[in-house]
């Protein structure tokens, strides 16, 4: 006689739905197909993805980066906004490898959850595919992990991995930066994917609702605006101006104060002008609602500057003009100076 303890069990009984996983793959394949580019030999579906480095690179150096979206995901869950965090995921990695002069070639993602919702996962991957299109890289693989008991229902985690290439002679390392060079800032779309633990704390203090009006837009649209992807615009500037662009910094966790020093040699400092750009209304509101000090704002948030370029002074106007042609909002936000005793490597004055 069979009892409940000897009845046949299935993977579905344990909480893993193979059919849902297969359905998701079917939804993903056409999304990934839109991102294909020359060089992809084997994409989604194989045990490993294959990519041939473009022949235009004479001495190719591969540049890799990996990242997540951080606690911005908490708001995605709470506010049911899943279609843009995939763009964030791509942006965080491709912008990171861009700063060394690399052209992103391909991207892979990791999506982990406790119970797979095909619709939610497809919305996330749709954002990833859109991010890859914006960056010009191929979505050639990924992993979807349904792990019962590991995540609450409706929640998930994301990680992404980007690989790009740059000619060895064209690697940007900041070593040629010198006093007198100009610091240009490219506008961000908002908080991007950093500082969201503080953002959430301020939203809680303010009693904010996702549907409340914020200067003519729903607050959710402003707070969840996807991270800007600067790849095509900056690559166009590098192609035209080459060595005039001496350093690039992606302004992520640590804000301006911690990220700009990462491209400076000892003895160099970036002196940024507080009035060199207008801090967007979102950051003004966050600072006011949270009573956040200026220094804390500059070391947590991008404060409206998502990418920094250090360029030769005599080429600054030309580089800025090229970036504006590509649709960028460009501000001249400071200059490189000799670092004085006791001076931080990046200061806002």
UniProtKB/Swiss-Prot annotation:
This is Phosphoribosylformylglycinamidine cyclo-ligase. The keyword Amino-acid biosynthesis does not apply. The gene is purM. InterPro entries: PurM-like_C_dom, PurM-like_C_sf, PurM-like_N, PurM-like_N_sf, PurM_cligase. Keywords: ATP-binding, Cytoplasm, Ligase, Nucleotide-binding, Purine biosynthesis. NCBIfam families: purM. The lineage of its organism: Bacteria, Pseudomonadati, Pseudomonadota, Betaproteobacteria, Burkholderiales. GO terms for biological process: 'de novo' IMP biosynthetic process; adenine biosynthetic process. It is an enzyme of class 6 (ligase). It comes from Bordetella parapertussis (strain 12822 / ATCC BAA-587 / NCTC 13253). One of its GO terms (cellular component) is cytosol.
């Amino acid at each position: 006689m069979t009892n409940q303890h000897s009845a046949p069990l299935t993977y579905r009984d344990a909480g893993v739905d193979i059919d849902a996983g297969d359905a998701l793959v079917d939804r993903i394949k056409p999304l990934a197909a839109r991102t294909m580019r020359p060089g992809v030999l084997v994409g989604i579906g194989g045990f490993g993805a294959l990519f041939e480095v473009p022949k235009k690179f004479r001495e190719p150096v591969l540049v890799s980066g990996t990242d997540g979206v951080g606690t911005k995901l908490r708001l995605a869950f709470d506010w049911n906004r899943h279609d843009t965090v995939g763009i964030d995921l791509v942006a965080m990695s491709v912008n990171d490898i861009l700063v060394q002069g690399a052209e992103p070639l391909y991207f892979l993602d990791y999506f982990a959850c406790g119970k797979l919702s095909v619709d939610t996962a497809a919305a996330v991957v749709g954002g990833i595919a859109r991010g890859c299109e914006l960056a010009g890289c191929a979505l050639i693989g990924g992993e979807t992990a349904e792990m019962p008991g590991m995540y609450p229902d409706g929640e998930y985690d994301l990680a992404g991995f980007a690989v790009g290439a740059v000619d060895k002679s064209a690697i940007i390392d900041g070593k040629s930066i010198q006093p007198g060079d100009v610091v240009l800032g490219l506008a961000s779309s908002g908080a991007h994917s950093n500082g969201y633990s503080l953002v959430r704390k301020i939203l809680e203090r303010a009693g904010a609702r996702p549907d409340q009006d914020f200067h003519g837009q729903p607050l959710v649209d402003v707070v969840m605006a996807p991270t800007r992807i600067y790849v095509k615009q900056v690559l166009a500037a590098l192609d035209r101006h080459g060595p005039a662009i001496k350093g690039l910094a992606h302004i992520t966790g640590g804000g301006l104060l911690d990220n700009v020093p990462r491209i400076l040699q000892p003895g160099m400092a970036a002196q940024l002008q507080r009035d060199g750009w207008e801090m967007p209304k979102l950051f003004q509101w966050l600072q006011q609602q949270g009573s956040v000090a200026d220094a804390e704002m500059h070391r947590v948030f991008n404060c409206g500057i998502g990418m920094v370029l250090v360029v030769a002074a005599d080429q600054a106007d030309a580089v800025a003009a090229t970036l504006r042609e590509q649709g960028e909002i460009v501000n001249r936000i400071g200059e490189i100076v000799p670092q004085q005793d006791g001076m931080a490597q990046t200061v806002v004055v």
